[in-house]
Amino acid sequence: MTNNDAAVEAAGSSRASSSKQQLKLEITEKVRVLCLHGYRQNGEAFKNKLGSFRKFANKYAEFVFITAPHVAKALESAAEPVPEQRSWWANKDDGSFKGTNKGGPAFGFQESLRCVEEAWRTQGPFQGLLGFSQGACFVGLICGLAKKKLTSIRPEFAVLASGFLSGSLVHMSAYEEAISIPTLHIYGQTDEIIPKEMSESLAARFKNAEVLEHSGGHYFPATAQQKQTFINFFQDRLQEYLEHEELQQSGNASFVDSGAEDDNDAEVAAMTAELDESD
């Protein structure tokens, strides 16, 4: 092998190796989760409430919190709405929301769906969704809409705490098909706002559902008792994600190798022509 041949081979090998390395660096080490707060909450307040939970799962997941576009109706008719209290949609004619309400409207839902779709697109990539109370109801609806390809959001897993099926008539079609993505459903035995039977009904719509039932009420639990469940769930999701990325990387690397060989052939031909001319 001449020095020129060796140089050409080294250049091609280096370029292919660099392409493979670039693909490998693009694989993240955490799954990313978009989080939806409950009624009368907002993204920042929800983030603060989940401080302990985030510490448990921080090694495996990154959580991004957004705020609903609608200000919730004031608790008292004569009072002014509180800007920090937000709502994803209203299901009562007076513009308020109640999880147990059946057959009502869904005022503002489409605007909120566009808000989440925009966050999914611009703040992503994301792999999962997490929601609490109204936010968990929303996550369930998004999963159903994604199954029917009626939203641009494509969650690979979801966490639903104190969730429930929406009673709004326009949402009924979202529950027509069973959903197969992995989900973790969290609810309290003494929840008086969203009774556990409502959360169980939501969980029943998912084929691959894991349930974490706690002894408390309407809140997102994050004690030592729940820690291992959270860790195991996100460990599994991260492993699935990395395995999927590795398969994609292998396919892309093969494609890059093929392209590199073609480029090498062209370079070899060019250098050979130059050598012939110098002879």
UniProtKB/Swiss-Prot annotation:
Pfam family, one: FSH1
Enzyme active site: S133 (charge relay system), D191 (charge relay system), H218 (charge relay system)
Assigned EC number: 3.1.2.-
GO molecular function: hydrolase activity; lysophospholipase activity; serine hydrolase activity
UniProt KW Hydrolase keyword: yes
Keywords per UniProt: Hydrolase
Gene Ontology CC terms, in alphabetical order: cytoplasm; nucleus
EC main group: hydrolase
Region described as Disordered: spans on this chain: 249-279
Family membership noted in the UniProt record: Belongs to the LovG family.
PANTHER family in the cross-refs: ESTERASE OVCA2
Name listed for the protein in its UniProt record: Esterase CG5412
